[in-house]
Amino acid sequence: MQDPASHSDSLVGRVEVKETTCYMCACRCGIRVHLRDGEVRYIDGNPNHPLNKGVICAKGSSGIMKQYSPGRLTQPLRRKAGAERGESAFEVISWDEAFAMLEERLAKLRAEDPKKFALFTGRDQMQALTGLFAKQYGTPNYAAHGGFCSVNMAAGLIYTIGGSFWEFGGPDLERAKLFVMIGTAEDHHSNPLKMAISEFKRRGGRFISVNPVRTGYSAVADEWVPIKPGTDGALLLAITREILDKGLFDRDFLVRYTNAAELVIDDPSRDDHGLFYRAEMHVEPDCFDPQNKLWWDRDIDGPISTHTPGADPRLMGRYVLPDGTPVKPSFQLLKERLEQYTPEWAAPITGIPADTIRRLAHEMGVMARDQKIELPIKWTDCWDDEHESVTGNPVAFHAMRGLAAHSNGFQTIRALGVLMTVLGTIDRPGGFRHKAPYPRPIPPCPKPPHGPEAVQPNTPLDGMPLGWPSKPEDLFVDAEGEAVRLDKAFSWEYPLSVHGLMHNVITNAWRGDPYPIDTLFLFMANMAWNSTMNTVEVRKMLVDKHPNGDYKIPFLVVCDTFASETVAFADLVLPDTSYLERHDVLSMLDRPISEFDGPVDSVRIPVLPPKGECKPFQEVLVELGSRLKLPAFTNADGSRKYRNYPDFIVNYETSPGSGIGFLAGWRGKGGDQFLKGEPNPHQWEMYAQNNCVYHHELPRSYQYMRNWNKGYLHWARAHGMIRYAEPITLHLYSEVLQRFRLAAQGKRPGRQPPERLRQRVETYFDPLPFYYEPLESRFTDTQRYPLNALTQRPMAMYHSWDSQNAWLRQIHSHNYLFLSPKVGLAQGFADGDWVWVESPHGKVRCMCRFSEAVEPGTVWTWNAIGKGAGAWGLAPNADEARKGFLLNHVIAEELPAHEAGEHLSNSDPVTGQAAWFDVRVRVYKAEAGEPEVTSPQFKPMPRLPGQEKKRGKWQAYVAGIFGKQAS
């Protein structure tokens, strides 16, 4: 091998280092891309980036192989005339032809019935733009992948504490002493969390992981607590009961910062039963909780306005107000609810011994009580009380999809929020800390459209396609209480479906329920494979026809970077760029990368020109918005407003003159303003000069207690993050849920649920968290199907993005079913055998591996490693297709017909969260002589026009050999 130092610059070639933001997962680390003669040769972490500080993972460094993947789409494609959908029979067309097709079709739909156009996207990180496009077009049928991912986590915590894990908050491991992680796979939060856990353990912190599987983060935990899937709520409620019984809750925190002491009307005969008693009745603003409630003061032994100086409210007891109204503090109601949830009750449900549950509760409670943190930071609360320091209780939690992806996930996550609250850990040192733009009011201000009248020809929606209902009047239903959206979000079936129900879109569109559509536009959403449930049947729906020969879903547009399984079914294919070829924003209007100490947003700036005819999806939307003359994309005379996407990002404002746009940094003509300021024509250049990231560090006095921090709330209002500088009281007791329950009981005027759904709403909209068995288990013979089945993301793969990656395939080219040896022993098969995994909905054949690191009643596998033959540029006989498998084949997207409806989604009844972890299976050995290949198999997908036929010279590159010798 030759020494590169001995070569001249002319032999080495032109070497450049360019900075941008990674997109190999949702972590969005800063990266440096090293190029030689315009080709990517190395990617490393940017040491000057506040998020990852130079650290990079296997995914991030493998972005080279994503860039040069043979799975790349490079030209717009149209299904050939006479060819059947699903056959991948395409012809190349120009972008002018593609835009003309879309403009003609979408303009006609917008002029006649905008809801016949549906736009659904995957993990795209640009929902502020896609949501804006849908609103401006006038279609309610829009959502991203959240309903399929972790909407229960977002909704469950935001409706409880005003913020959530992941982008909007997380564990303060810098100061925590006890860290409890529940239901979190290896991909979530990635580098920053790994770095934080490493430092936490070096400082002697104790790490407990609660998970059915011990992989990834759990493997480095001090204690692994295996739990049966879907029973986390039972554990959390039992722990909370123990903490209350032992008096280990933070009374001062509960009184001052939560609704624990607020008096709730306790008279089931009244129509306002379960609502807070209000000292004055008036029309409430849309999005803050007025401080017009009462406490029961122990000194005067009577009612008093909340936060009266010197008041000492009671948390327990039953009282009668002077007007005869019986009331209880909401904490009393919580305590009564928890009486049934003993450790002995929870033990057989969770598989965790009662003594362990008691020990965990004691450990959390004592740590929070006895190891308090005090920081010398002065701050002033909303009631003008000045504090000399910020205090904290050093117990931190982190949780994700393991809790969320169940039909009981919303109430489970409400239970987690209540536990975190009674321990006094919210936005305090060592506990949970918010990230801008959160905290927000409970619930946040935006609301969905209110009814069918919101959808009008050639008119934007009167609300956002997605929002945060606070009462039945906020639902998006017709006069009969039935859904207006295609996915039935914001209907009485799933009232708080704040992220939509992507997983039911194809089924509903195929059935024409609640109505037929014309055009389904999918971006980066592999909805014919791993981004759906009941995959075999969904693929059939995409090709199903009416008796007259027309497709039941008339027109399908797919925009993607790669030849995914879904591309085969498209009528029109739009080739997206890679993340190294485009401008992109990770915006405060969307899902930013903020830190605990203040807002952070970032950008991607092209380091390479687009491959072939690829065009960024963002450019596609700006172009379509201009052609369709959508108001946000055009001037008053209908002329085009923005040259392109970068111009749109610089000059767009949320309202004329608001000074608030997609990017927070370097605003104002001279780039000297932040968060709010007039457009800066040099904004992109300033981001490029500053590591592609903007980090605004708040004053220390604004960094904690932000729900009630006067300085922070006024700052947040001034910079457009919230509308009102009002305290954001934590909701131990949810009056929002009680309003829906009262409507279901017929005790509330206005919108009422259809009769078939009254019992469903009354049951699941409980204002206090409760545990119930996952819905699918009620319709499944659990004796025949005794095992829970799960998937999780491996550390080296993210969704289905990376199975075409030449480097990462060497780590995961196929997946196994992992299970306890006890299952194999009972069923007569051995480690490595071919087995069948069967549910009531379908079955898959795969190879198994025994593992002691799994709860004995659970089987699991890596998600999205299995691929359809020929997809993603892989050979039809690739391991991903022959040995890899997809568990989605055995998961139903709908529940069996029952009293609440014939076609209810297999989802959480509150949020519509896909319940893909609820599935029950049995596992048995494949018969001798069966093919040693996974099942089901599908017809191989041929290589598409524009895909590379062979791998380029870049894959033969050897470090240390430069210039022409490497070619």
UniProtKB/Swiss-Prot annotation:
InterPro entries linked: Asp_de-COase-like_dom_sf (IPR009010), MoPterin_dinucl-bd_dom (IPR006657), Mopterin_OxRdtase (IPR006656), Mopterin_OxRdtase_4Fe-4S_dom (IPR006963)
Binding site residues for [4Fe-4S] cluster: C22, C25, C29, C57
Superkingdom of the organism of origin: Bacteria
UniProt catalytic activity: a quinone + sulfite + H2O = a quinol + sulfate; a menaquinone + sulfite + H2O = a menaquinol + sulfate
SUPFAM superfamilies: ADC-like, Formate dehydrogenase/DMSO reductase, domains 1-3
Entry's transmembrane regions: none
Main location class: membrane
Entry's EC annotation: 1.8.5.6
Subcellular location: Cell inner membrane
GO-annotated molecular function: 4 iron, 4 sulfur cluster binding; metal ion binding; molybdopterin cofactor binding; oxidoreductase activity
Residue ranges constituting the 4Fe-4S Mo/W bis-MGD-type domain according to the UniProt record: 15-71
Record note on disruption phenotype: Deletion of the gene causes a strong decrease in sulfite oxidation rate.
Keywords per UniProt: 4Fe-4S, Cell inner membrane, Cell membrane, Iron, Iron-sulfur, Membrane, Metal-binding, Molybdenum, Oxidoreductase
Cross-referenced SMART domains: Molybdop_Fe4S4 (SM00926)
Keyword Membrane among UniProt keywords: yes
Matching PANTHER family: DMSO REDUCTASE CHAIN A (PTHR43598:SF5), TUNGSTEN-CONTAINING FORMYLMETHANOFURAN DEHYDROGENASE 2 SUBUNIT B (PTHR43598)
Family assignment from sequence similarity: Belongs to the prokaryotic molybdopterin-containing oxidoreductase family.
Quaternary structure annotation from Swiss-Prot or TrEMBL: Forms a heterotrimeric membrane-bound complex composed of a catalytic heterodimer (SoeAB) and a membrane anchor protein (SoeC).
Full protein name: Sulfite dehydrogenase subunit A
Organism field: Allochromatium vinosum (strain ATCC 17899 / DSM 180 / NBRC 103801 / NCIMB 10441 / D) (Chromatium vinosum)
Protein's gene: soeA
